[in-house]
Amino acid sequence: GSRDSTLTKMKELAAAHDNVRYISFSRNFGKEAAMYAGLSHTTGDLVIVMDADLQHPPAMIPEMMKGIEEGYDCAAARRTTRAGESKIRSAFSNLFYRLSNHMTDVKMPQAAVDFRIMTRQMVDSILKLSEVERFSKGIFAWVGFDTKWYPYENVERTMGTTKWSFRGLFKYAIDGITSFS
């Protein structure tokens, strides 16, 4: 779904390196579909999920690996700040977590993000779920694997702008709450 030169660069990398693969969609099907497709094509013992816009700092990966080495099935990040976001978006995000944790049986830490390292066992459990409308943050919590949380300070995007509209985020929040209530 990306409209920049990402696909061209991925094709070049895949041609040069046998261990690089990519998935290309005919259009933008959304973050959840992209994550599910990515997870379903993984083969390794460990899987890292992170945003490509560098809002999830790759430099955290070695520290997060320590959680996996300690025996956790998941090492995940959560924001300590919401730098780069409007106050209204931050307020609605905080409200979402409070409502979701109050109204559902799935408890998600405040400011949890999708940036995480997961074991193959956890990924396989996620892939067995048949949800059509997926809400990954909830699914990651619902499958019940031990998770170690790593705080990080949110950073502003280095390039581009978010494609999430307020309406899209609101629908995503409603889907997240109704999926687990």
Give residue ranges: language-model regions.
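A conserved acidic beta->alpha catalytic loop
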Residues: G1-T8, L54-Q55
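Acceptor/aglycone-binding surface of glycosyltransferases and processive sugar-polymer synthases
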Residues: E12-L13, N19-R27, K31-H41, L46, ...
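Histidine/lysine/aspartate-rich catalytic loop segments that bind and position anionic ligands
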Residues: F145-T147, E153
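Beta-strand scaffold of nucleotide-dependent catalytic cores
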Residues: K137, W149-Y150
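Short, conserved catalytic or interaction motifs in soluble domains
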Residues: R27, A52-L54, Y152
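Alpha-helical membrane-interface segments at transmembrane helix boundaries
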Residues: I174, T178-S181
